Swiss-Prot record:
TM stretches of this protein: 12-32, 49-69, 71-91, 122-142, 153-173, 188-208
Activity regulation, free text: Leucine export is inhibited by the proton ionophore carbonyl cyanide m-chlorophenylhydrazone (CCCP).
Record gene name: leuE
Reaction equations catalysed: L-leucine(in) + H(+)(out) = L-leucine(out) + H(+)(in)
Induction (UniProt): Induced by leucine, L-alpha-amino-n-butyric acid and, to a lesser extent, by several other amino acids. This induction is mediated by lrp.
Superkingdom, taxonomy of origin: Bacteria
Organism: Escherichia coli (strain K12)
Record's protein name: Leucine efflux protein
């Protein structure tokens, strides 16, 4: 399938893409957190931010920016530390709000929803490892002798985005159903938010110590 477009072993790629999407990460956690705290609208806005951010990174990977980042340690470190700082900021903000017992529902909906999208977009864009991963993973399934490798890259990127959409939709719908139950269990919600905040701090520490 898609061999005429320079895609090799598409079904193997699809299985690999599914397993990759299932691996927990900050983007997934952010979408799940917002689907629980802000419902399906908040979850899908977070997912849209992730999709757009990933699409930009995939395009940059295809355009050769990944090679530039990999061969320029200073540039890699700048993006890496920005990403780590942002993850730490998000984690600290969640922990602070949880400890203070702030009620996010008291805020107006539109600013909150706009912030969700922006945070998800920034979260996705400030991950230098993602752009390097796209190149190293995609190149295994592209026929370099094909006349239009850009089409091959697009097919692989679109497939990954579709798999991600299906998985995140499952999380969003599940999170929305959990929302009503969580709202009646304030202690449980507080523990859950604290764990999410700590996980973001952990992701920040891991990203800060990664090497190119």
């Amino acid at each position: 399938m898609f061999a005429e477009y320079g895609v090799l072993n598409y079904w193997t790629y699809l299985v690999g893409a599914i397993f990759i999407v299932l691996v927990p990460g900050p983007n997934t956690l952010f979408v799940l957190k917002n689907s629980v705290s802000s419902g399906m609208k908040g979850g899908y806005l977070a997912a849209c931010g992730v999709f757009i951010g990933d699409a930009v990174l995939m395009f940059l990977a295809w355009a050769g920016v990944a090679t530039l980042i990999k061969t320029t340690p200073i540039l890699f470190n700048i993006v890496r530390y920005l990403g780590a700082f942002y993850l730490l900021y998000l984690g600290s903000k969640i922990l602070y709000a949880t400890l203070k017992g702030k009620n996010s529902e008291a805020k107006s909906d539109e600013p909150q929803y706009g912030a969700i999208f922006k945070r998800a977009l920034i979260l996705s864009l400030t991950n230098p490892k993602a752009i390097l991963f796209y190149v190293s993973f995609f190149v295994q399934f592209i026929d370099v002798n094909a006349p239009h490798t850009g089409i091959s890259f697009f097919i692989l990127a679109a497939t990954l985005e579709l798999v991600s959409f299906c998985y995140l939709s499952f999380l969003i719908i599940s999170g929305a159903f959990v929302t009503q139950y969580i709202r009646t269990k304030k202690k449980l919600a507080k523990v859950g938010n604290s764990l999410i905040g700590l996980m973001f701090v952990g992701f920040a520490a891991r990203l800060a110590t990664l090497q190119s």
